[in-house]
């Protein structure tokens, strides 16, 4: 698990041995690993998504912040396209050069965006937060 995390990260140096050990510990328990991959299984198995499309998706009315790493090896940016049709108040921020692990690969920028969003302020773009 630790090798997967570090090899898929944009900034492997941000993953201390302690953090990787937590991923490995949590991922080594069968019940935890099952929970960790069920989201992806549901995407692949299908059925639920197409069934829900036929029934209609209720629009999400809660203000929503989506932070997305453009270099995510598990989920492409295309996954986010059209999300605004299902979320009335969506703020979407892309992180160029950042992997699936946005909060670890770009913690300063992700936290600045979360802080602004939770305060009701304008959420900055990733590029404007670069040091």
Label the predicted regions.
Residues 1-51:
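Helix-rich cap/lid subdomain of alpha/beta-hydrolase
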Residues 19, 38, 53-54, 123-131:
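Short, flexible loop/turn segments with low-complexity composition
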Residues 19, 52-53, 76-83:
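Short alpha-helix in the alpha/beta-hydrolase fold that links the catalytic acid
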Residues 28-31, 75, 105:
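Residue-level signal for the nucleotide or nucleotide-sugar donor/cofactor binding architecture
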Residues 47, 71-75:
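Acidic catalytic loop of the alpha/beta-hydrolase fold
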Residues 54-61:
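Serine-hydrolase catalytic core
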Residues 60, 66-68:
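Short beta-strand/loop motif that positions the catalytic acidic residue
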Residues 89-131:
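Catalytic active-site module of serine/aspartate enzymes centered on a nucleophile-bearing elbow/loop
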